[in-house]
Amino acid sequence: VRLTQQALMAMADEDGLPLVGAIAAGQPIEAIENINHMVVPEQLKTDNPCYVLQVKGDSMIDAGIFDGDWVVIEQRSHARNGEIVVALIDKNNATLKYIEQYPHETVLIPANKTIKPMRFHPNQVEIQGVLVGQMRSYQHR
């Protein structure tokens, strides 16, 4: 999921951010932009361009990120080891995971003991952004 900085700034208003689709917290899913708009509390935004994704799956449950939650992502192409990132794998599939980067390997680590880490050559993984906030609805639909 990659929007230009101009597109993100144009779509963000005082309270809202672009809601650009879903992110896998499980098996990676195809990265598709489906842009809507979502009101986001000021405390969940940063000074840099941000966007919102809805979580699909249970690979991050031990980090308190559940299926159906909305995550606020700061768009950037770098992250520190241990941060939760939106990772684009092979320029096609996106997932939300902890990241550990080494010279010859990038490891995407779930927060669910039943799911194994995914290991890739660094050229296969592109960081699309870093988690900076989260929202949840307790309404059953």
Which residues are covered by each model-predicted region?
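Short, positionally conserved secondary-structure boundary motifs
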Residues: 1-61, 66, 94, 101-102, ...
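C-terminal regulatory/effector modules of DNA-binding transcriptional regulators
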Residues: 65-141
